[in-house]
Amino acid sequence: MSSVTTPAPVYTWTADEAIKFLKEWNFSLGIILLFITVILQFGYTSRSMFVYVIKMIILWLMWPLTIILTIFNCVYALNNVYLGFSIVFTIVAIIMWIVYFVNSIRLFIRTGSWWSFNPETNNLMCIDMKGRMYVRPIIEDYHTLTVTIIRGHLYMQGIKLGTGYSLSDLPAYVTVAKVSHLLTYKRGFLDKIGDTSGFAVYVKSKVGNYRLPSTQKGSGMDTALLRNNI
């Protein structure tokens, strides 16, 4: 006696159900999107480091979420055309994520800073202040960099780095580390404002795949490779 297999019912989402779903989740989705928009809009290192870190976490999570969604589309493709596009998008997303990790690891080897895994930029400005290396991300490699000291507080490109410094502590060179090379900036102008404030302008002087000798005497290390990063 042969048995007949009953096909599984195909569930279709009606327009009324879609409208009901949007009505139920519209408020929550709006709050989430507003939160992400505010973080992406105002997340800058010169404004709030805490907000900027949250922004970096959101950007970093975009890659695995994208890969998960593209794989999901491959498994539940509507037809062969959708399947083909989903496979291509999955491969592209995975390759780009691998490239990101490779570049980040190369930059980490050069700088020793966890800022190397910043998903927004591969440019890290480095300044050696009395043997302590400060590393912070910048969007692009500018032709000039400005270092400011206001009553002992150290700022570089508007980003606060530390306290307890004077103009005499500023180095002759600062660097911007990239994945494949290092940019050296030479101090071209120094101006003192009052007793404890002033600024210095550094101009790009060299670009190449080399390392700048450390200002620490007897350390034998390179400026862009010091491990005591802040």
Curated annotation (Swiss-Prot):
Subcellular location as annotated: Virion membrane; Host Golgi apparatus membrane
Virion surface side: 1-24, 77-84
Bilayer topology term: Multi-pass membrane protein
Protein name: Membrane protein
Family: Belongs to the betacoronaviruses M protein family.
InterPro entries: M_CoV (IPR002574), M_HCoV-like (IPR044362)
Main function: Component of the viral envelope that plays a central role in virus morphogenesis and assembly via its interactions with other viral proteins.
GO cellular component: host cell Golgi membrane; membrane; viral envelope; virion membrane
Gene encoding the protein: M
Domain of life: Viruses
GO molecular function ontology, one term from the record: structural constituent of virion
CDD domains in the cross-refs: HCoV-like_M
Pfam families: CoV_M (PF01635)
Protein's organism: Bovine coronavirus (strain LSU-94LSS-051)
Topological region Intravirion: 46-55, 106-228
